[in-house]
Amino acid sequence: QQCVLMEKPLGAVDNWFEPGHQFEWYFLLESSPLLRGSALHVSLDHAFTLTEQRGVDPQTGAVVAMLDLEGSAKDATQRIWAQAEYLRALTLRPESEASVLRQLQALQQRFLHAGGWYECRDENGEVSRKDMPSTTPYHLATCYRGLVEFLG
């Protein structure tokens, strides 16, 4: 997939891409005024659309962990940080209020609970990891900030 940013250098054996990283990079690059008009900036919309089509379940809004070069699920685990990055990226999409609200509700219902969050769900949507690693709050905080700016 030449329109997405791969996890390994181009041409590397057994390469893949992670929708969560695509959405994170989309947000960071799309929000940068320094990239406006560049070839990279122009390709962002196509990369977002492809990643959303291949890496997000249209029924549940679940973002899978990894896709192979053809865009098929290589790891269908659903990690909370990827869900948060997708939600944050949606805040920069045109006419996205309904999508943002739908994805926010999915995040709340599937991953958040009174004591914190579920780190991972398996391909069937069952909780597969209950610990709460210290790397996740970064993604939740930046998602929250994006939501505050978007929703006002």
Residues covered by each model-derived region:
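Glycan-recognition and catalytic cores of secretory/periplasmic carbohydrate-active enzymes
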Residues: 1-152
